[in-house]
């Protein structure tokens, strides 16, 4: 596979739908390539390889692509649905901590900040945000299995995702009033985060 030929702008069907093509630029070609061909060690003309992109997003693109018949369209659906669900979970999280009025503003700012359009493109950002907010949402409710599970999905979405393990661990210890005698076996659920990274490295 010659990655130098991966399109800067991702083609869709039919070609006349340029209003869809604008949502497929920059890294979209890499995600489409992984969704179609998975990972390999072939470098493009600039020395780049597709294993620099983490697998959860293109994996979901491939799965949904079997249903809708087009990986690019599936990427658009995943990104926009993840964005909407992420906003919903953000509202629940902030509402629980600071009230519904603050939650309304948080979601409004999420939709209106200048680069929010990225969440609608064929990039992994919206999926990353959904999984990250979900991890904190469940951590705040002391549901550590789900918090760790979504933390693991964060680590499978982007390279920086593994660092969510630090605030999750802090929240866990805070919930236990930083008393080591109160630590229970559920702390092991946080191991899903490095496990997610380890699965990709294998």
Predicted ranges, named:
Residues 89-92, 109-112, 118, 127-146, ...:
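Specific aromatic-rich, kink-prone transmembrane helix
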Residues 1-19, 42-46, 66-70:
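Juxtamembrane/transmembrane-helix boundary motifs at the membrane-water interface
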Residues 22-41, 46-69:
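Short hydrophobic/aromatic helix or loop-helix immediately within or flanking a transmembrane segment
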Residues 67, 97-98, 112, 116, ...:
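Transmembrane helix irregularities
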Residues 1-5, 23, 153-154, 161-202:
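Membrane-lumen/periplasm interface segments of specific transmembrane helices
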Residues 46-53, 64, 74-81, 109, ...:
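Membrane-embedded glycan-lipid processing machinery
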Residues 59-63, 74-97:
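Transmembrane-helix motifs of polytopic, lipid-linked glycan transferases
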Residues 70-74, 90-112:
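Transmembrane-helix signature of polytopic, membrane-embedded enzymes
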